Amino acid sequence: MIRTIAIAVFSTSFICAVKVAAAAQLTNAPPKNGEVVISWNSRGTLEIANQVTGPWITITNAANPYTNVLTPAPRFFRLNQTVDATTLRKKILCGYQGWFRCPGDGGNQWIHWSRSTSTIASNTLTFEMWPDMSEYTHSYPAAGFSYPGGAQAYLFSSQDQQTVDRHFDWMMDYGIDGIFLSRFVVTVANHPTNVLVNVRNAANRTGRTFALLYDMSGQPTNTLFTQLTSDWRWLVDNLHINDDPRYLHHNGKPVLMIWGFFADRFSTNLAHQIIDFFKTNAAYGVTLIGGGEWWWRTETTAGWSNVFRRFDVYSPWNVGNYSTIGPNKYASTAYWSQDLAAAASAGMLYLPVIYPGFSWDNLMQQPPGTSKIPRLGGDFLWRQFYDAGNLGLDMAFVAMFDEVDEGTAIFKVSNTPPTQAYFVTYEGKPADWYLRLAAEGTKVLTGERPNIATIPISP
């Protein structure tokens, strides 16, 4: 009779109880009969309790940090995968828009689902992928849309805490570190906080990390600096956002991404004014990530070469940038190695943008398939992780978690969307396929699995 039991624990939500039959030592030696050996993901810590309600105690083993042998007693154990929020290193973070609204969520508008705030119809759609709604506890009927079997189709609102909780539960369950929450400068005059509070609550509950990404698109240049800095001051002074234990920090400062540094959008004087404030202000200073043009290194517009080399981290926007290899399109990554060297010579870190594919035909009112950059079953995404791993990069920005508008979402999407309009699907791959691929890519960049050119898991 084999009495030794080996159990691997990979999910925070997984709690198991065992009855250990014999004494065991904290040792790296092979187990003896009657011992229960536990192994777990290196990105987490094992917690153990005598009852399911706790108290939970972290256990360690100096000989082998990711295995342990339990002492005799009924034991409950779980994996605590709280993300280290003190550093950008070994972080793969997703962009998170959080901008979807539905009538009945406290407002009375379709926002980012339809170009008409009062109506949703096949000719008003502004999104490309229908989310898999099977796990949401709060949803809203989309009148006139039904699934292939005839059932009413539903959508979610980012205003609901339950929606954001569901998204963060997926991040926790699949091993995704957290997000950059988009905050659009053009909308922050009155300091909206609802989605930010939802994210903050969910991150603290699940042990994920988050940081803000200010998107400067559309804000008039004469008010850009004031509106941007006033909102950050307000968040620090009133919400104490930088003191949240789940808010991402690096080198002791809160991390902030500011996106929209393109040479044709505003002057270098304004760019330097923004950078000066966020890098030098004693009370409101941050570790500053600049997001903008992917050709930053070779930008020839006067003065911009210096601008692009002043950040703490630079993240080139690569979505839509691809090369054709044979019959297929693949994300352009050949420039990353020179970018990495240029960033290092300027004293900056480099945060590449990785995306799974692209399509925005409904948004742009184009014939179906016009703009599509196919996902190739996940190979389009995986090759970017592979290329980043070959360069020794240990951080990345995945664009995006919930962006169904431009078909770049990695969260759960329906393969059987409503039949009343054109939608992109995961082409038969499971709804969680891209969450799983992002998790495996995370392991590559953090050194937890070998870097190989082909997708290492099966659907």
Which role does the model predict for each range below?
Residues 5-10, 16-82:
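Short, composition-biased motifs enriched in small/polar/acidic residues
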